[in-house]
């Protein structure tokens, strides 16, 4: 069993687990990078610590400073944990329809929440946060969508961990959100082997898949670099729900909703390889644990009811 000097030191080092039952064939294997094993239960612990370390090193954050961040979920929770440990005050701008779990977790770690109008979603939260940052220049505005430390977190840790554990990797699949995971881990993996395909799972245009975004709908994160990607794969809300339930029922992995979208893309890529007579090792990200989504009913209702039950509330 590994020993760490502090909670922050335990971030990362997550297992890569094979999915023998969901893999399309014995020669086309799926591998789950279990980011739910991080301290707050999501991959965003890597991002939060990387952004804090960079801000401290640059002098952007002084002891006792106030941190500002737009978020509808995991990044805020990760920052709240890290800010509490390091003695910072955190203000999160969140859409007013963000799920109760998110608000309760943030408040538990001492974060202050400023609500933005629900109609604008996370894009409106970003706009409000930028206004507040301009009005309060003494605050540390980390801004995950444009912070190079977000990408660096995955270039320096997530990507190397995957390649060390799976040197035969042929495909890497992750969700399109801030794009930090895809840009960082994807760039690292393609440097190690240019033949590795990097696939972004994104919501089908006009559909809502929680925690992900379709960049054709108006907001393109500053971190996004299309040259890192091999392709973008569109996923519907129902696909996400169905696959996250498959992951639980078939492989026993209890993951969050966006992971269902990523798994759906990974399985489709695997099926393509089978049809083409190719072997493949496909690594994908399990973004967070399903315990943050219990009140959605996703894991108990039928698929149609579960999909409808997500409408109107941000769960990631």
Residue ranges and their predicted role:
Residues 1-316:
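PLP-dependent amino-acid enzyme catalytic core
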